[in-house]
Curated annotation (Swiss-Prot):
Its EC number is 6.3.5.2. It holds the Pfam family NAD_synthase. This is GMP synthase [glutamine-hydrolyzing]. ATP binds at S236, G237, G238, V239, D240, S241, S242. The lineage of its organism: Bacteria, Pseudomonadati, Pseudomonadota, Gammaproteobacteria, Oceanospirillales.
Length: 526
């Protein structure tokens, strides 16, 4: 019997930092399972979770302010390895008798720390440069206003900068560590090695969390959960539902039926590609509901983006329900819920990130649906879902395809949605994406798409003036989709794409490129 992949686990306590999920992703990339819980987790819950070690993440507040978050006191009596990052280090120092003060120099961005103690800690055999006095130097990323100004009893300084003499600390006899910088961001060049030292050498975790083992574990869980029952999955062609389809098919074969709703708002040939991939190549039972007319007639005359989204959502449920009703004795509904959905859903209910196991319904499902949920990806981050997709044999270009909104082209056609507009947009978008692939830039940008503007602009063909529609192109670069900058594509490429769209698609006289960053603009136009 292979070892339980959840048995060597790390607990991450969240103090509200934007980097908390990134810490969890880094821990898992190293091959160790972890979960995120709020900072005020009870002692009973911590003991039940039974971690090999605890990471106290960062947070936006100041330890010096009354009522700011604190780590559970029980942690300091449990003999568990602890790693405090940024705010996590500060609250650890303060709670154990050290002192934290506001700094008159905010450290934000790149910094160099000098290693004062490297043996038996996070920094053993790790360096980027060597200082004049022979001590190792590390390139790191800082983001803090406060700093630790007096060590708690039993701690020593392990790294320093000129403006933060206590940039890292460690206990002389216990496996407790604090760093003022962020090892989880790529700007801290040796960050992964530091985390690996903490997880593997200090906490003693085995690196069991790998795509192959995750798939084995998920298959076992699904088989135990659904037995011989039938399972229904709404297949969109997006990454999450595609990976769920491949995973469930491997686990339960013909007990799975997928319903693919073609709403007329998909990308060029997307419906046929989904059917070829899943029904033809993989032998999965897929029912295709051709509901283009239904969607377009309900959207007729509607200009408001929010109402368009709602109409598309409600119509999807109507069509899906009608197809589901034709399939007898289905007990389970599969969903592509992933871990960030679970965290966000819990945070919306409680004001903070919460537990994986609490029941999470992504919303939009009818109240009277008498099916139970099976969500095989609910423990996984998006990058893990992609790796599992590749491991299951899905093509790279499908797994690493850019995000596509749920309402599809419905929110990339400004104002009213018409079949004519959708057809023009599909062709324009396909040319844009094809040329990005040809220039080997598709996977270098995070998202790229065309937008249909329902305004007519004057153009000249031969000697004749003509008034035709405008296409906007949007391409962005981002790490987390919370902020994004417009992609600086080569002018020659933009010229080529523009010429092709105007010459090959009747009805378009002008192409523009969107140079807005997020914020203030959003990535999608609607």
């Amino acid at each position: 019997m292979s070892e339980n992949i959840h048995s060597h686990r790390i607990l991450i306590l969240d103090f509200g930092s934007q980097y908390t999920q990134l810490i969890a992703r880094r821990v898992r990339e190293i091959g160790v399972y972890c979960e995120i819980y709020p900072f005020d987790m009870s002692e009973a819950d911590i003991r039940e979770f039974n971690p090999k070690g605890v990471i106290l993440a960062g947070g936006p507040e100041s330890v010096t302010e009354l009522g700011s978050p604190r780590a559970p006191e029980c942690l300091f009596n449990m003999d568990l390895p602890l790693l405090g990052i940024c705010y996590g280090m500060q609250t650890m120092a303060e709670q154990m008798g050290g002192k934290v003060a506001g700094s008159n120099v905010r450290e934000f961005g790149y910094a160099q720390v000098k290693i004062e103690r490297s043996e038996d800690g996070l920094f053993e055999n790790i360096k980027d440069h060597v200082a004049e006095d022979g001590k190792p130097l590390l390139d790191v990323w800082m983001s803090h206003g406060d700093k630790v100004v007096a060590l708690p009893e039993g701690f020593v300084i392990s790294a320093s900068t000129p403006s933060a003499p206590i940039a890292a600390m460690q206990h002389e006899s216990k496996p407790w560590f604090g760093v003022q910088f962020h090892p989880e961001v790529t700007h801290t060049l040796q960050g992964r090695r530091m985390l690996e030292r903490f997880l593997v050498n200090i906490c003693g975790c085995k690196q069991l969390w790998t795509p192959g083992r995750i798939i084995e574990d998920a298959i076992t869980q699904v088989r135990n959960q659904v037995g011989q029952d039938k399972v229904l999955l709404g297949l969109s062609g997006g990454v999450d539902s595609s990976v769920v389809a491949a995973l469930l098919h491997r686990a339960i074969g013909d007990q799975l039926t997928c319903v693919f709703v073609d709403n007329g708002l998909l990308r060029l040939h997307e419906g046929d590609q989904v059917m070829d991939m899943f029904a033809k190549n993989m032998g999965i039972k897929v029912v295709r509901a051709n509901a283009q007319d239904q969607f377009l007639s309900k959207l007729a005359g509607e200009n408001d983006p929010e109402r368009k989204r709602k109409i598309i959502g409600h119509t999807f449920i109507e069509v899906f329900d009608a197809e589901a009703a034709k399939i007898k004795d289905v007990k389970w509904l599969a969903q592509g819920t992933i871990y960030p959905d679970v965290i966000e859903s819990a945070a919306a209910k409680t004001g903070k990130a919460h537990v994986i196991k609490s029941h999470h319904n992504v919303g939009g499902l009818p109240e009277d649906m008498e099916m139970q949920l099976v969500e095989p990806l609910r423990e996984l981050f998006k990058d893990e879902v992609r790796k599992i997709g590749l491991e299951l044999g899905l093509p790279y270009d499908m797994v690493y395809r850019h995000p596509f909104p749920g309402p599809g082209l419905g929110v990339r056609i400004l104002g009213e949605v018409k079949k004519e507009y959708a057809d023009i947009l599909r062709e324009a978008d396909a040319i844009f994406i094809e040329e990005l692939h040809r220039a080997e830039l598709y996977h270098k940008v995070s998202q790229a798409f065309a937008v249909f503007l329902p305004v007519k602009s004057v153009g000249v063909v031969g000697d004749a003036r003509r008034y035709e529609y405008v296409i906007a192109l949007r391409a962005v670069e981002t790490i987390d989709f919370m902020t994004a900058r417009w992609a600086h594509l080569p002018y020659e490429l933009l010229e080529k794409i523009s010429n092709r769209i105007i010459n090959e698609i009747s009805g378009v006289s002008r192409v523009v490129y969107d140079v807005s960053s997020k914020p203030p603009a959003t990535i999608e136009w609607e």
